[in-house]
Amino acid sequence: MATSDSEFNSDLLLAHKLPETRYTYNERDVAIYALGIGACGQDAVDSDELKFVYHRNGQDLIQVLPTFASLFTLGSLTEGLDLPGFKYDPSLLLHGQQYIEIYRPLPSKASLINKVSLAGLQDKGKAAILELETRSYEEGSGELLCMNRTTVFLRGAGGFSNSSQPFSYKNYPSNQGLAVKIPQRQPLTVCEERTQPSQALLYRLSGDYNPLHSDPEFAKLAGFPRPILHGLCTLGFAIKAIIKCVCKGDPTAVKTISGRFLTTVFPGETLITEMWLEGLRVIYQTKVKERNKTVLAGYVDIRGLSSSL
């Protein structure tokens, strides 16, 4: 059950303003992130992926993968939020879904101001579903670069409602981030990529230091035989595959990303991403080859395609 210093008050909760956060990165961070989601992991001179890590005319010219934007939200949830009458244990947090809108190509370095707001909260009895929206603005120009909506499942945080009707709040369009229906026909294209045994250790260098992904003893206490791969790392692999196979290698073609995390991936497993094109939307699902399990599903909206696809 959720614990609180005062009785839960929905009016106080909805009026509560979350503090702004700052995020600064440079070309080195961009390259480390790309390596963390498998760029050049199969072929160090793959021209489709080398551009995310290196540019002969200077690192400031490397291209940025759109899922790099997911890093801008780091810390908001894992460190715990000060919400009136609602507390949770960050160690019991499970990442359920990530939704990202990209408004302009991400620069290779930037200082950002993140404006964070509550997008949703639902009391599920023994657990709660919490959604945060983060809008990232370039410091100086004030230009809005992107928006993240992070959905997490909080074990043990439910039961905070002070009426017989479970508390439920959602503040975004109902058509955003919906679960996708996977087409029954054969996919347009399929990408297979093996993760490295050290993949989680490499990905954590981008700032997600949750010991669930690195500490064997911590993973066992959480019920896993060994450390698991970050869900956002799996998402990065999938979107990178879509950029390569559908967007002809152009990361700026990605407009919207939605991904639901269905089960865990272990570092070293092989990811198979299947893709279907419906207008300007790519529906995808990612499976673990070794266990034949679907681990991720969602969609990507793109800005346009050449007629030769």
Swiss-Prot record:
A motif (Microbody targeting signal) lies at residues 307-309. Its main location: other. Substrate binds at residues 95-96, 124, 208-213, 231, 261. One of its GO terms (molecular function) is oxidoreductase activity. Pathway: Lipid metabolism; fatty acid beta-oxidation. It is an enzyme of class 4 (lyase). Ubiquitous. Pfam families: MaoC_dehydratas (PF01575), MFE-2_hydrat-2_N (PF22622). Its EC number is 4.2.1.119. InterPro entries: HotDog_dom_sf, MaoC-like_dom, MFE-2_N. This is Enoyl-CoA hydratase 2, peroxisomal. It comes from Arabidopsis thaliana. The lineage of its organism: Eukaryota, Viridiplantae, Streptophyta, Embryophyta, Tracheophyta. The gene is ECH2.
